């Protein structure tokens, strides 16, 4: 009965009509994909997990949704093949290379922490032609400007197609981030970090998937981008476009 309830919820969620736009979720052009489960820890057998995930995928697709249906595959990784047997179109990932909730600013050079984004089970994903999307990432508790572009570089080297940052702070609480005080991101209060995140967008638009620039410190300069711990600096330098975080 619990699985039936989840199927019903997902199907009706996709058929929900936005009261402001009049568009159903399944038809919303801004909905590029849907993740049907976040960070699951499955205790069942592979066959049971495939059956469960398949039912949820089916409930979404039954609505008429045409875009990819994704599943968080970074937990219970021993079930990787079973996830794809269920008909998912790809996996979702996260990255917190400096941990979470240190309660004060971390000190030191963390570029070695983001040298590579390793996906040990990547052959399974590529065999199934699965999409790879990072739904949340941050170098938490680091109030510096240099690190985000290095993360974006490593994401692209790992074949990540889309990445979304966690999280942008609303202006009224950005001075202290009382919502979740391990992340700090706001254009007014952390302008250098905000510019650094803008550079990440440029990296995702220009760096090819799976392009590898080697290891730190040689990969601190790549294409038109550079990062420097010593200068707390990230840059994009093109004739028509120049971003400088400091």
Language-model segment annotations:
Residues 69-70, 80-141:
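Glycoside hydrolase catalytic-domain groove-lining segments
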Residues 1-88:
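Active-site mouth of glycoside hydrolases
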Residues 45-48, 101-106, 145:
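Short, solvent-exposed loop/turn and secondary-structure capping segments
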Residues 36-39, 74-76, 96, 137-138, ...:
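Active-site beta-loop-alpha junctions enriched in small/polar residues
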Residues 50-55, 109-119, 145-150:
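Well-ordered, non-membrane alpha-helical segments in soluble/globular domains
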Residues 234-246:
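Extended non-globular C-terminal regions
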Residues 141-223, 230-233:
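Substrate-binding cleft of secreted/luminal carbohydrate-active enzymes
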């Amino acid at each position: 009965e619990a699985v039936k309830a989840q199927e019903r919820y997902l199907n009706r969620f996709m058929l929900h009509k936005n009261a402001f736009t009049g568009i159903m979720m399944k038809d919303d052009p801004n909905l590029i994909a849907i993740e049907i489960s976040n960070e699951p820890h499955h205790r069942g057998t592979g066959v049971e997990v495939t059956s469960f995930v398949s039912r949820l995928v089916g409930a979404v697709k039954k609505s008429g949704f045409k875009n990819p249906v994704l599943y968080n595959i970074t937990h219970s990784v021993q079930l990787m093949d079973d996830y794809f047997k269920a008909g998912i179109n790809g996996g979702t990932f996260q990255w917190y290379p400096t941990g979470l909730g240190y309660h004060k600013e971390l000190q030191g050079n963390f570029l070695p922490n983001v040298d590579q984004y390793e996906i040990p089970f990547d052959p399974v994903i590529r065999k199934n032609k699965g999409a790879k999307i990072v739904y949340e990432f941050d170098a938490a508790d680091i109030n510096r400007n240099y690190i985000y572009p290095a993360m974006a570089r490593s994401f692209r080297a790992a074949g990540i197609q889309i990445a979304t940052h966690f999280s942008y702070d609303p202006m009224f609480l950005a001075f202290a981030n009382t919502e979740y005080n391990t992340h700090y991101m706001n254009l007014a209060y952390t302008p250098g970090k905000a510019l650094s995140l803008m550079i990440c967008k440029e990296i995702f638009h220009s760096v090819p998937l799976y392009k590898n620039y080697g290891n730190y410190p040689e990969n601190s300069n790549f294409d038109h981008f550079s990062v420097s711990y010593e200068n707390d600096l990230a840059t994009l330098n093109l004739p028509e476009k120049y971003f400088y975080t400091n």
